[in-house]
């Protein structure tokens, strides 16, 4: 009788399966890592070193897989690693994404609409080809588990092999690795899915510390005093436009060849600041930092919610605080203030300007509607209004503006940015800046309608910049340690009808640290914590 043997009837040792998965991940999830490594160490002169890197990555991958994989969770763990490798490598290879804790926090706060913008055919092809199909093979594989004693020996042997693969290359090329880790340290952040796994563990530790942290607010401005009251002068009405994803080198006032802010160019008395650096490279990190007393050197995004911020101080002193948000949310900035002072403008519930485009995306200008009612309800009071933009949020820049701002053509109308002709990507991004220009100009126009009764002022600062394909990097979110300047150099503008608010010199080197003292000065508030800190006004 003829026997028939199907491939799925053959069994496989669990440690062989782990090795195959580790090899697959090392080979398919790290294309960007090897590309970055070879850019620093050309293959023509460093073939041995590059090969040693590949072996070391395989060793590290095997070590991680073996550490996480045990009999009763073997297949779920391997499948999870395969899916994670496919997803993380797609965004790394496509957008240059690096998975540090800040990026993970930003990803967790990404809403459904933003996630949809990142989904495309290439994404699903990658996930199916490098994630789902290998996972199916793992799921149907028949695993021949050894006895407990043999399994322990085989696990130890596999650990030994992984350590040999990891350490021997480092030993053979020790001088080059010493230089690599010292001078080119950022390149290692591109290793997937090891970096995401490490960052998940680190983030879990951070979240645990937050969960066990004291809930009492840590005050930084108990000594804050308002030196003049609205009863002694004209009350102040200030709009702070919290920008999104605008970069300084695409602003005409900073030498850019295009008129991306033509309406602001016509505003008398507008001050531009050309040398401003953001606190971070993501909304989740930068926005709380923009209102912090700590300054970016001492700022900790994980404990920011427990810290008094400048809005808490101004609210305590009687300044009316209002936050309207067409982005994600206030990132914790408004958490300690009454919910009645925060309004979501990302849906038609509050935003009346959502049907001007094919995407039914609510526009930033909708946040201006109805502000007169707020002013009337707080007549004679100092007021600070935050307008948090959608701005230039990527990758779907073409969705961020209406047809009247489509000045630069053709435009990239997709979210696979690397596949777009580079100039079309720039065109879409610059058109979105034209919409921001219009929004800021309209904010100033609205303030001017209240000049008779208020000293009015407008401050605009973007939360971070954006990479548009420079060196193969797109979007934002890179760790500060090696973020390109495009992700941290941001535009900032100031305008007021009050001539006593003298803007700082345009080329003054400033950071997001200048925002808190500026907001205090606009309401004649002094606080020792920031009394010597540079501001946008003198």
UniProtKB/Swiss-Prot annotation:
Changing residue 106 to A: No affect on transfer of phosphoethanolamine (PEA) to a lipid A analog in vitro. No affect on resistance of E.coli to colistin, by comparison with the same strain expressing wild-type mcr-2. The keyword ATP-binding does not apply. One of its GO terms (molecular function) is metal ion binding. Zn(2+) binds at residues 244, 283, 463-464. It is an enzyme of class 2 (transferase). Changing residue 91 to A: No affect on transfer of phosphoethanolamine (PEA) to a lipid A analog in vitro. Reduces resistance of E.coli to colistin about 2-fold, by comparison with the same strain expressing wild-type mcr-2. One of its GO terms (cellular component) is plasma membrane. It is a multi-pass membrane protein. GO terms for biological process: lipopolysaccharide core region biosynthetic process. Changing residue 476 to A: Abolishes transfer of phosphoethanolamine (PEA) to a lipid A analog in vitro. Reduces resistance of E.coli to colistin about 8-fold, by comparison with the same strain expressing wild-type mcr-2. InterPro entries: Alkaline_phosphatase_core_sf, EptA-like_N, PEA_transferase, Sulfatase_N. The keyword Cytoplasm does not apply. Its EC number is 2.7.8.43. The modification Phosphothreonine is found at residue 283. Disulfide bonds join 279-289, 354-362, 412-420. Changing residue 114 to A: Abolishes transfer of phosphoethanolamine (PEA) to a lipid A analog in vitro. Reduces resistance of E.coli to colistin about 8-fold, by comparison with the same strain expressing wild-type mcr-2. Keywords: Antibiotic resistance, Cell inner membrane, Cell membrane, Disulfide bond, Membrane, Metal-binding, Phosphoprotein, Plasmid, Transferase, Transmembrane, Transmembrane helix, Zinc. Probably catalyzes the addition of a phosphoethanolamine moiety to lipid A. Phosphoethanolamine modification of lipid A confers polymyxin resistance. Confers resistance to polymyxin-type antibiotics such as colistin. Monomer. Belongs to the phosphoethanolamine transferase family. This is Phosphatidylethanolamine transferase Mcr-2. It comes from Escherichia coli.
């Amino acid at each position: 009788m003829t026997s028939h043997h199907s491939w799925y009837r053959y069994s496989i040792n669990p440690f062989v399966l782990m090795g195959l998965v580790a090899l697959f991940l090392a080979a398919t999830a790290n294309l960007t890592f090897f590309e970055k490594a070879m850019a620093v160490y050309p293959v023509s002169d460093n073939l041995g070193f590059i090969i040693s890197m590949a072996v070391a990555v395989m060793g590290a991958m095997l070590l991680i897989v073996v550490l996480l994989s045990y009999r009763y969770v073997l297949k779920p763990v391997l499948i999870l690693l395969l899916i994670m490798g496919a997803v993380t490598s797609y965004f790394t290879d496509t957008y240059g994404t690096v998975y540090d804790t800040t990026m993970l926090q930003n990803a967790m706060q990404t809403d459904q609409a933003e996630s949809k913008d990142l989904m495309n055919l290439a994404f699903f092809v990658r996930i199916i080809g490098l994630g789902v199909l290998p996972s199916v093979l793992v799921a149907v594989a028949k695993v021949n588990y050894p006895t407990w004693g043999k399994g322990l020996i085989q696990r130890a042997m596999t650990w030994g092999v992984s350590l040999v693969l990891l350490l021997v290359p480092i030993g053979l090329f020790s001088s080059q690795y010493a230089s690599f880790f010292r001078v080119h340290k950022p390149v290692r952040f591109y290793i997937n899915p090891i970096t995401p796994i490490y960052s998940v563990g680190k983030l879990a530790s951070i979240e645990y510390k937050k969960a066990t942290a004291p809930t009492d607010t840590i005050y930084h401005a108990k000594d804050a005093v308002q030196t003049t009251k609205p009863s002694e002068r004209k009350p102040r009405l200030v709009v702070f436009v919290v920008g999104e994803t605008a970069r300084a080198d695409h602003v005409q006032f900073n030498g850019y060849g295009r008129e991306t802010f033509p309406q602001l160019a016509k505003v008398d008395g507008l001050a531009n600041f050309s040398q401003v650096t953001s606190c971070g490279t993501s909304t989740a990190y930068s926005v709380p930092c923009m209102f912090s007393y700590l300054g970016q050197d001492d700022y900790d995004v994980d404990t920011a919610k427990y810290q008094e911020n400048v809005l808490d101080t101004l609210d305590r002193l009687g300044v009316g605080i209002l936050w309207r948000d067409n982005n994600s949310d206030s990132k914790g900035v408004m958490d300690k203030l009454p919910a009645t002072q925060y309004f979501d403008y990302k849906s038609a519930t509050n935003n009346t300007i959502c049907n001007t485009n094919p995407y039914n995306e609510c526009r930033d200008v909708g946040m201006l509607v109805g502000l007169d009612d707020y002013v009337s309800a707080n007549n004679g009071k100092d007021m600070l209004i935050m307008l948090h933009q959608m701005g230039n949020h990527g990758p779907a820049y073409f969705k961020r503006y209406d047809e009247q701002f489509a000045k630069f053509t053709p435009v990239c109308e997709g979210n696979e940015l690397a596949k777009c002709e580079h100039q079309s990507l720039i065109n879409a991004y610059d058109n979105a800046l034209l919409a921001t220009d219009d929004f800021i100009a309209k904010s100033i126009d609205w303030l001017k309608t209240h000049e008779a009764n208020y000293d009015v002022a407008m401050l605009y600062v973007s939360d971070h910049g954006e990479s548009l394909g420079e060196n193969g990097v797109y979007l934002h979110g890179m760790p500060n340690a090696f973020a390109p300047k495009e992700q941290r150099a941001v535009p900032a503008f100031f305008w007021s009808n009050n001539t006593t608010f003298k803007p700082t010199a345009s080329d003054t080197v400033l950071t997001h640290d200048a925002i808190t003292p500026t907001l205090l000065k606009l309401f004649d508030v002094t606080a020792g914590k920031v009394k010597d800190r540079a501001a946008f006004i003198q």
